[in-house]
Amino acid sequence: MKEEMNLPENAFRELKDGEEYKPLMSPDKVYPEVNGWSVTWGIMMAIIFSAAAAYLGLKVGQVFEAAIPIAIIAVGVSTATKRSKALGENVIIQSIGACSGAVVAGAIFTLPAIYILQAKYPDMTTSFMKIFMASALGGVLGILFLIPFRKYFVSDMHGKYPFPEATATTQVLVSGAKGGDQAKPLLIAGLVGGLYDFIVASLGWWNENFTSRVVGWGCDLADKAKLVFKVNTGAAVLGLGYIIGLKYAFYTCLGSLVVWWLIVPGMSIAFHDSVLSAWDPSIVKTVGAMSPEEIFRAYARSIGIGGIAMAGIIGIIKSWGIIKSAVGLAAQELKGKSDVDENVKRTQRDISFKIIAIGSIVTILITFLFFWFGVMEGNLLFAVIAILLVAVIAFLFTTVAANALAIVGSNPVSGMTLMTLIFASVVMVAVGLKGPGGMLAALIMGGVVCTALSVAGSFITDLKIGYWLGTTPKKQEGWKFLGTLVSAATVGGVMMLLNETYGFASGSLAAPQANAMAAVIDPLMNGVGAPWVLYGIGAVIAIVLTYFKIPALAFALGMFIPLELNVPLLVGGAINWYVTSRSKDAKVNNERGEKGTLIASGFIAGGALMGVVSALLKFGGIEASIAENWWVNPMSEVCSLIAYILLIGFFIRATKKKSRNYNP
């Protein structure tokens, strides 16, 4: 366990002509990877982190990638049990467990919209089986569609893509193999973050948000000028911002500030006495009579939706060459002699293209039958159009999802799914499927596409980790299917639990992406139309941003996720910049940065898991919170700010504290 283990010098740079990357585990040897230990722990991680990610995603609209915390737990357990040669096993644990965040993102960005619209249309009904099938089938399609692109992203483009999350996870696994004291900072941070978020969610000792309305002039500014500042003070969201990093968090927050501080006040000035209800007859207030939050929900967020859709289209155009080459490679292999080329190194063996082709056809057929009998109530035409839309869009957007993970470590599936929903709704209405039945069908279709893209993007991270360390891709690919099915079952259960406990229509669960999906699909399916002008403005903004090489997707995401959830991302990103740049010694900065990643992972895992515990307590009728009466008092927000500053202080101080035996 303590043998000399370091990644090769050329692990993170482009290879020179004729140079070959040699992974940590030799391609010529066989190592323990898939066994009872790794599969059991992988399934446990998938269940635990699916529940945690579902709660966090529905509460604040952000889903963390579970790869890093799962890798740390895998390392901690293998170290505690003194398992030898556990590196390959830990990669499998991480790969199976990481299905959690990916499947959750796919499910919760779309399927809760069914519950949200159910309040308005009681005829719309869903079940555990529908949620499970949409998530499971989408996840399986995502894995099958991504495998042909593995070699391009992880091997051909070696050193050209940063793979931020894969890098962090790989470093954790390597550090564990060295025998360092990796788990301690994570456990302490998990306890701190978990206790902090539990106090807010279950006890209500301080407000979960700090806003400018805490003072009198702030209330006046919000009422008259429609200007407001808000920040969620939770530990989990702060940790998320740290892992995302300053650059991506900055552009996301910038998009949010443009909407909240320019567009929202600007609309109030320009249309102060107007009722803008052309695409939503339920709007009866003048713009001037609305709060900033109401203007955002009714109008400004639609600009972000248009921006996300256009950024997705630009992504497909940029990826067209990759798609063509991968399809060509798959066609060549299908015409080849055998399933497995014995000359291919262990570290380059994939599931054969024949199995992928057969698996894809069977999965598409099962999805078609699910649509035909489970969603479209036996209408063959609707089912055929639905499966064609889902299969083509999921395949085309697979490279966009993988590209996003490879560059920024964050998968913009919500934007791509919004575009899918808009397109699918227009097509389904054209063939005669409207009203609540059409909404349900389009949302289930969106759930399948969203999960496919989310799992595909996440899986490229796992495969890059395996490439750096020297595991067998075929084993990662095969066991990823099991993790996907387990995660799909877990997220279905958690989603139904949270709906019973809080209710998606109550406002207690932010679920911003699902609310956006509901807002888009309702007018489209009722023939009212949609805010095409606002979508168009967003699309133009995305084109202009792309021209100036500004990440349009990050900016547009910020435009439609609420301000209070974007500001803490910037705070976390700023902490990342601060702790990794204060020393003149690059090695010290690097050590602090990695320590910060462990602490942020602890905040995320601890905060999210306690969120699930809080939901279970509430569901069981155990209520000890003083929030209902206390949170209306501005002092609850003052307490929130003080607690947040102390939390940030702990974070920064903990990164500078040198652990005994800490060996990054």
Give the residues covered by each predicted segment.
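Alpha-helical multipass membrane-protein architecture
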Residues: 1-664
